[in-house]
Swiss-Prot record:
It is an enzyme of class 5 (isomerase). The gene is LUT2. It is a multi-pass membrane protein. Gene3D superfamilies: FAD/NAD(P)-binding domain. It is found in: Plastid, Chloroplast membrane. This is Lycopene epsilon cyclase, chloroplastic. Its EC number is 5.5.1.18. GO terms for biological process: carotenoid biosynthetic process; xanthophyll biosynthetic process. Residues 1-45 form a transit peptide. SUPFAM superfamilies: FAD/NAD(P)-binding domain (SSF51905). It catalyses: a carotenoid psi-end group = a carotenoid epsilon-end group. The chain crosses the membrane at residues 441-461, 475-495. Belongs to the lycopene cyclase family.
Amino acid sequence: MECVGARNFAAMAVSTFPSWSCRRKFPVVKRYSYRNIRFGLCSVRASGGGSSGSESCVAVREDFADEEDFVKAGGSEILFVQMQQNKDMDEQSKLVDKLPPISIGDGALDLVVIGCGPAGLALAAESAKLGLKVGLIGPDLPFTNNYGVWEDEFNDLGLQKCIEHVWRETIVYLDDDKPITIGRAYGRVSRRLLHEELLRRCVESGVSYLSSKVDSITEASDGLRLVACDDNNVIPCRLATVASGAASGKLLQYEVGGPRVCVQTAYGVEVEVENSPYDPDQMVFMDYRDYTNEKVRSLEAEYPTFLYAMPMTKSRLFFEETCLASKDVMPFDLLKTKLMLRLDTLGIRILKTYEEEWSYIPVGGSLPNTEQKNLAFGAAASMVHPATGYSVVRSLSEAPKYASVIAEILREETTKQINSNISRQAWDTLWPPERKRQRAFFLFGLALIVQFDTEGIRSFFRTFFRLPKWMWQGFLGSTLTSGDLVLFALYMFVISPNNLRKGLINHLISDPTGATMIKTYLKV
């Protein structure tokens, strides 16, 4: 489940054993043939956890900027990602039925927002509300991912009416049957209500719309941006903002030499069951308990995953098996196998399946080049939190401020050409020094956590939940400042066993993200 708030996290992972507990690598090779996929793929060789020396995918990728862009789009699991994106959601309104069309040949727009997800709709609505002439461009697709959220965060956004179910308690299981209570209410968001609310804001603010894919953004001699669409329409605008998801490398430039992107994958099902051990009054944030009951660990058990469970009633639940983060994408079929094995071990018998979900979230990777003239927002702007895998709350909360900066830029430059220095003001709003320090900290942790097996991750959480409550709750809620995160790390260091301290020091010295984190923190 893609979560609007913070569901799972990857700041640091440690082992309490005498040596680091590293993940074993088992190659899982699948061959697929894609002939009718719009991305121009011919064939893909996928490795679910193969050796680092093997290529993760070999394909013709006409619509991707490079290998990294392809991985962000779905990589070896792209068929499942497409299945998720193209689900039928008849209850959600079509944008083309609610928004007026962009008027072709009727002068330049102030702003074009490319992408129709939560980030794109929110930014378009907020910008138009400030008096800008805003056009929204992108495929007319519904919201298909299930969303979970800390209730107070959505209340702060004025979106409490979009929550369809609330659990007053949220719990975590590690390696026994005694749960850790989070002490914070958690909600399930209605995809339909969220889509309708953001669309309503676009309608009321006067956003126009074109259902099309964008091929390129170029600059005209007069300084206008020319947004070329695949239907041969070219939309002129004073400024273009890309909000079309993480795989936006053909429209944006990213910093060279940054960390390799990792991926969080999850397979979920909403089902009717005969019986369930989960309390309908409690949302299960993470369940890392052993579910195999086998003395000899199987292939599936070597991949660290946890169960995420939303019990709407005693018999209707949403289950999701999640791989926190991995350098090599964990395949959905393996996640499904693990989920079914887990449910079987728990004695849960499925009577009816209402929906399947394939959640694919790129985490980490490089920041956009903040010198470029085109802007970005949401996942395209690397706003996905490396420690949680989510970006929607940040996108929705920062849309008003970002729109205000864009409006101010355009007001100041009414008779001037938009240039990189002006665009830099908007980039600095998204990525001020404080945000960069936080991100550097989380990237360091992400590089650490992908090394560990299930027991190593459990070891981390046993230490994590010994921290002061404000610390681990603040981490889960993404409210800790960069200074707080330093205190977080120091406290973890103090209460951890000696082997953990040694391991953290070695990782800080040997991994490039350690040097980057220190350098970023030392910048004035």
